[in-house]
């Protein structure tokens, strides 16, 4: 998941699905923003400084009470133009403006040749523009102890370890290699 870089407050990934993009410290996109959490997080960590900027425009802010909350909390930098926002976040103005114009063309064409994104909302072309400094964060763990249907912990040979029980996120769980948002509710419902 994505967290605000200074406070570690969770920043909803849904904004990327709604049309936000991520740019790195060079002012460039670097990933299909709606990829799986593990892939996007790894790409974000690999960027200079291990952070990126989540970029939205006023049209997105008007439609989202979540973005409005982020603005009120002071998480956002703001600019009346692409160049002003670039200056506010410390990235090259020309590069950032080119990135934004290229993204808007991707939205118009419904095609992202560079990163293969297939989810397009509206262009990010309504001033002012906002950016939140984000980084990868942890809010759920996967993997762990193997249990049976009685929640008894099993050793590496699959045998019950007498008197040892486990439940919730400490167990191997049902998620496999990646977790879908909301799936952890099953853990909470079953195990309390």
Indicate residue ranges for each PLM-predicted region:
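Residues forming the flavin
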Residues: 1-191
